[in-house]
């Protein structure tokens, strides 16, 4: 049996302000830093250690991972960073307030943009400073691969091949792996692992800063999965994620 630990980054400054973030590189809030520390302490308490880590190219995931590894006394392990684990790109919604957007377009429309499987938001023009072709961290990635907007289906299309080609290989070698990423890149993995329907993934809420453990068989099929920590706190955190994008 193998174990894989997934962690969504701690609360970011834009999570706190209820803004669409996507590929915008924002920092952790004070609460997010505390969540990352708590995740690290919880993993340490439960006896977890890691051989290799994976993360996105965005600071909030990197910083969460670094804090967790520091709490575990494992800042020395290898970390592989990839744009393929980035958050879903929210296109022209990036930087907009979710509640204000719901008031303008309607909650149902915003829910579709946020959580539907195959409907992307309005795209960014390549001249827009928010477009990833303007960001030097993506300068080595072919321009045609960089999104101007994404639906979850698009995110799955870049995350799952990376799982298969890179992360799964390390798990099968017996390495203890942690992945620190984002709400939608992790939803892509959970959908794949649990064979969720498009309707079921719409209802999936992954809370910030709480370790999600998958136990996998020899073929990397899931045996079971569970969050670490207090159940009532986990439930409250999931409800908080679900409430985003609603009128206040």
Swiss-Prot record:
The gene is gpmA. Keywords: Gluconeogenesis, Glycolysis, Isomerase. Substrate binds at residues 8-15, 21-22, 60, 87-90, 98, 114-115, 183-184. Its EC number is 5.4.2.11. It comes from the Bacteria. PROSITE patterns: PG_MUTASE (PS00175). GO terms for biological process: gluconeogenesis; glycolytic process. The active site is at residues 9, 87. It comes from Borreliella burgdorferi (strain ATCC 35210 / DSM 4680 / CIP 102532 / B31). Gene3D superfamilies: Phosphoglycerate mutase-like (3.40.50.1240). Catalyzes the interconversion of 2-phosphoglycerate and 3-phosphoglycerate. Belongs to the phosphoglycerate mutase family. BPG-dependent PGAM subfamily. Pathway: Carbohydrate degradation; glycolysis; pyruvate from D-glyceraldehyde 3-phosphate: step 3/5. It catalyses: (2R)-2-phosphoglycerate = (2R)-3-phosphoglycerate. This is 2,3-bisphosphoglycerate-dependent phosphoglycerate mutase. InterPro entries: His_Pase_superF_clade-1 (IPR013078), His_PPase_superfam (IPR029033), PG/BPGM_mutase_AS (IPR001345), Phosphogly_mut1 (IPR005952). It is an enzyme of class 5 (isomerase). One of its GO terms (cellular component) is cytosol. One of its GO terms (molecular function) is phosphoglycerate mutase activity. The record marks 182 as: Transition state stabilizer.
